[in-house]
Amino acid sequence: VNMQYNQSAEGECQEENCDFTRSKSGKRIILILSALIDSRIAPLEFYALVFAMYLNIIFDRHSLEDVVGVGDVRKGKGWRNASPAKIIPFVKHLVRQMDQFPERMNTLYVLPVPSLAKGIWHFIRGFLKASVVDRVDIHWGSSSLHSSAPKTLLEFFDQSAMDDFERNRRSEFC
């Protein structure tokens, strides 16, 4: 999970201290690199709890701010790169944790999901509330190590944001 931000003491974003990436809609972005999840290091429930704790830290309790999530499922060099089927329990735990943060996730863009995973997505949808499913936007494509993010994302993010996603992903390579 990665979000770069710098706010003033009042929680306002000023031109001189805004160093976090935003979507075209102006929302802060949380980048989630699911291929880093390694159940040999910690249980999947732990990863979901850490994500919830991260949200608790970054959000002002008196704010109604919501964010855009970008779930990047591309493989990474030196990462666990678990199959989508192995991540299903993580998704279940994450949904339970996210119930503590209603309305905080505006949209979750998941990319690039291989076409073969369509069946897995339809399975996962069964565990999610309709209001959550409506906020998930899947972008299909190759998720190999050297795959580019789908160009369909340019509708929601400018090229500099897309470059930030890739730079952050590659910075985690071992």
Language-model segments: which ranges?
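Basic, amphipathic alpha-helical/coil surface patches used to engage anionic, phosphate-bearing ligands
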Residues: 1-174
